[in-house]
Amino acid sequence: MPKVEIYKSILLEKIGKILTKSELVSVLEMAKAEICEFDTVNDKIKIEFNDTNRPDLWSCAGLARQIKTYLFGHLPLFKFFSMADNLQEFYGEILVSPEVFSIRPFIFGFLAKGVICNERMLETLIQLQEKLCHNYGQKRKRVAMGMYSSDLIEFPLSYTACNSDYRFIPLGMDREMSIEEINRVHSKGIEYSTILASFNKYPLLLDDKDKVLSYPPVINSHDIGALKVGDTDLFIEVTGTNLEATLLSLSVTACDLHDMGFEILPVKTIFPNETLFGKEIICPYYFQNMLEVNVDNVNKMLGSNFTANNMCLDLKKLGISAYFKELDKFYVIPPVYRNDFLHEVDVIEEIMIGMGLDSFKPELPKDFTLGRLSQIEEFSRKIKNLMIGMGFQEMIYNYLGSRTDFIEKMNIEGDDFLSVANPMTEGYEYIRGSIVSDLLKSESISSNFPYPHKIFEIGKVALKDLNSVDGTITYDNLAFLMADKEFSFNEINSLVSSLFYYLNIEFKLRESSKSLYIDGRGVDILINDTVLGGFGEVSPYILRNFGIMVPCCVLEINLNKLLN
């Protein structure tokens, strides 16, 4: 979970109220945060956040804004945001080339002027940059940020792609280096260039005089890419692979700098292709959607009997605008610096926090029940023990993933896969319909470990089902993978036979037509003419998609059907 260090005196100054240690501990619960350490000598507090969905809190300015709003009920106002129907005046342009749009497509920026940067302010900004890029930005893969002195920059900027022999002086060095050399020698290149490993060109940000600002998301330039004490005019840019995550990171930073006293001046980005919010976007940009919330649903979930007006007032404590036109529903307008409202239940959680957790009286359960393992759980545990006994290592994966991993790399249509309507990131846009893709992904990053590799998982998969009430059906599946140059169909066939022998279940095999397998080396498993799954040698085409160089055999069977 994210941890930040902030200056206590600055925090209390921005809140506008002196808080004792116990009062501060109490009010931090509202932000799902707790104090890890008090450093009275250096005037610092180390705070850990128990929620990764609120990057707006990972700074002194953001946390102070939330506490101040909670204590005094004043909604923060940021007038420099553009909206689809209300565009602000812009003070610079970023031109995106078609070449870079297929590599790392999104870049946005703004100018911040009017405050002299001191040492503590720079420390705060650098910490915010690191937390946004590392935690929210998935170690710069999804989002990366650059900060510069705008006095050294000539607009418009050009965001383009270059070859590996392009040379400039990177930050922390005193000589020119090629992109290839930076990737190989520079500490940041070694750490972050793998993000771009699948491309033969690299992102580059230049100003109108062809001076290099940065090689995103790896390293800034030596000449322009470092802030220093005494700078007054700043340029902030954020690049990324996810449009909304990139916009939100920029919005969070803009709000923080505004709260520090800076004047925020928007910058326009011009893309070669249309995006979800248009071909030209003036940033900071407000893109969040309004939510409709049913009053009865809130009261049912919280066990309360509040009116829409009560709920709107509780949301206001957390900086969330809400209004009602009807008695049975109200509308929520997310703050410009938040994008974590995916469903009505997220609003209900905020209402509960706004009411105060101590306002809910605990109640003992009224019904007495006996718990026991379900049949499928008992069956799964039996199979798990058998797999471990046969030398396999258990894996546990997320149920959500990307279309690339679940569908495209597996060379399937994916028509029966379930997609998330409003995913936070492209890495969590689909619910898995098979475990095999997860096993192959693990194998793709395990080539440095001694062979053979034998891994398995027993977990849930979900698919579309038009005959069910909600249009979906969930199964418990077993899948395993064997990887070694010596493994072939004979080895996996022997293991499958052993597994069914210990389960005391008879089965039949027939040749499979799935593209997952090499032709003639994959079979379906049948019991009473019902297909329960299959196994075989994985197609070299699919292995190449995952970057796997060693032959693999896989099995996947439906345990619910097997149990029945």
Curated annotation (Swiss-Prot):
Gene Ontology cellular-component annotations: phenylalanine-tRNA ligase complex
Keyword Aminoacyl-tRNA synthetase found: yes
InterPro entries for this protein: aa-tRNA-synth_II/BPL/LPL (IPR045864), B3/B4_tRNA-bd (IPR005146), DNA-bd_dom_put_sf (IPR009061), Phe-tRNA-ligase_IIc_bsu (IPR045060), Phe-tRNA-synth_IIc_bsu_arc_euk (IPR004531), Phe-tRNA_synthase-like_B3/B4 (IPR020825), Phe_tRNA_ligase_beta2_arc (IPR022918), PheRS_beta_core (IPR041616)
Catalytic activity: tRNA(Phe) + L-phenylalanine + ATP = L-phenylalanyl-tRNA(Phe) + AMP + diphosphate + H(+)
Main location: cytoplasm
Keyword Magnesium in annotation: yes
Gene3D superfamilies (UniProt xref): 3.30.56.10, Bira Bifunctional Protein, Domain 2, Phenylalanyl-trna Synthetase, Chain B, domain 3
Subunit structure: Tetramer of two alpha and two beta subunits.
Protein name per its UniProtKB record: Phenylalanine--tRNA ligase beta subunit
Species this protein is from: Borrelia turicatae (strain 91E135)
Source taxonomy: Bacteria, Pseudomonadati, Spirochaetota, Spirochaetia, Spirochaetales
Underlying gene: pheT
